[in-house]
């Protein structure tokens, strides 16, 4: 290895370490603050990093006062609803755009790409009016509604299907499979990694969605909305706020650790052919 290659490798590792530290510091600060007293959490002394005593009172108060189990159930229903709907619709639409030929295909997919470039806040008022007229306000269905179809999911699965060889479909036709059988038994299983990646993306977006739950649903509140309501106008109990935030982070961390292999494979496969 030449001196230039060594220097480039050192520079790359230095940048990666710097980026990792930048991303981990807020998370570590959240963990440490959750165990501190209010005085320690608001101290301006730069040397007060670790708590004097590791207190679990903030976690106990948050669990008792916020009914975390009920919030977890609401959030779980929200995530399951959006993930199932998004993966199902994106798989069907992605296969149609990626493997089938029909009139208006390019125009329709251009509209999908255009929707990806439009800020989601623009659709909030039309979505609210639709949910209101369908009588779904203050129900779990109102939370799931915006995630039934996603332009990003359609694009992701389309790229995954385009990366599969055409020989598979030709072999399936020779064996007597129709379009539905080819899709269900041959093509769809090969894009499982992309489906998992889309499911994780959808779960994360649903988990941190704040504006829509606050607008359309006051009775069935997910974790994101409950955390937002903990923040006061003039004062905040930072240890309790950080304890609640830490408890809210745990499911997403566990989800990613379980499916990180499929997540990386799905992104790599879908981005292999643009």
What are these regions (language model features)?
Residues 2-274:
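A structural signal for multi-pass alpha-helical bundles of membrane permease subunits
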């Amino acid at each position: 290895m030449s001196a230039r290659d060594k220097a480039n490798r050192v520079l790359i590792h230095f940048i990666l370490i710097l980026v990792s530290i930048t991303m981990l510091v807020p998370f570590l600060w959240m963990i440490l603050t959750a165990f501190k007293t209010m005085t320690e959490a608001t101290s301006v002394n730069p040397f007060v990093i670790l708590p004097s005593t590791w207190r679990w009172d903030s976690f106990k108060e948050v669990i008792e006062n916020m009914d975390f189990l009920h919030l977890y159930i609401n959030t779980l229903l929200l995530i399951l609803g959006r993930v199932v709907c998004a993966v199902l619709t994106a798989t069907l639409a992605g296969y149609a755009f990626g493997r089938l030929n029909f009139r208006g295909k390019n125009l329709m997919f251009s509209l999908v790409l255009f929707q990806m470039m439009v800020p989601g806040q623009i659709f909030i008022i039309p979505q609210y009016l639709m949910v209101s007229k369908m009588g779904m306000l203050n129900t779990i269905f109102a939370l799931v509604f915006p995630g039934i179809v996603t332009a990003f999911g359609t694009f992701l699965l389309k790229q995954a299907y385009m990366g599969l060889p055409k020989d598979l479909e030709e072999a399936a036709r020779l064996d007597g499979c129709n379009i539905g059988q080819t899709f269900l038994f041959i093509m769809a299983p090969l894009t499982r990694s992309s489906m998992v990646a889309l499911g994780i993306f959808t779960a994360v977006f649903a988990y941190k969605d704040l504006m829509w739950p606050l607008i359309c649903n006051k009775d069935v509140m997910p974790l994101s909305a409950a955390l937002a309501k903990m923040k006061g106008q003039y004062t905040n109990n930072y240890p309790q706020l950080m304890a609640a935030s830490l408890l809210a982070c745990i499911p997403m961390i566990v989800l990613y650790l379980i499916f990180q292999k499929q997540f990386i494979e799905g992104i790599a496969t879908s981005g292999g052919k643009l």
